Amino acid sequence: MVKVTRNFAMDTLPEDRFFIEKAIALAYEGMRKGAGGPFGALVVREGKILGEGHNQVIGDNDPTAHAEIVAIRNACRDLRHFQLEGCTIYCSSEPCPMCMGAIYWARPERIVFATSHQDAAQYAQFDDQFIYDELKLSREERKIHAAQLLREEGLKLFAEWRGMDGKRLY
């Protein structure tokens, strides 16, 4: 099997620099007002900013209020749609595992970021490596205990969902 290596520096567009600079400015804004860590993000389609956000974990006491998720929520609310086809998400830093999950669910076309997750660990003390490591382990090996209970009841819920008319898949 041949390993494909992409040169992401060549995957950028002329307007990317403008929007990355804006994401970094949002990160400074949130950080300086004490809302959270040094992270900012934008959702852009066809040169128009649809949603933006900075990290608000501390200000909102919400561990999910990362810049990317705030920007996605704002864009989806304003678009009145839960997916971001044709959009680019610009981030001051490479998204963490939680944010990558949200980004994949939102289905944008691309992501552009300034610093890597390794940079965030080395220079800003935001180290997500333990999450990447945990996700590779079985449920039994993970640090946070996970127990399965009432599977049959859960399957009944899924059966009703499958039989529903008019549901919107995502």
Segments (PLM) and residue ranges:
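Residues that line or immediately flank small-molecule/substrate-binding pockets and catalytic motifs
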Residues: 57, 91, 115
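Short beta->alpha transition motifs characteristic of CBS
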Residues: 50-57
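A short, polar/acidic, helix/strand-boundary loop motif
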Residues: 13, 57-58
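Zinc-dependent deaminase
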Residues: 1-32, 95, 102-170
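Short beta-strand scaffold segments in enzyme catalytic cores
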Residues: 38-47
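Helix-adjacent hinge/juxtasegments
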Residues: 61-65, 69-106
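Short, basic and Ser/Thr-rich N-terminal targeting/leader segments
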Residues: 35-39, 85
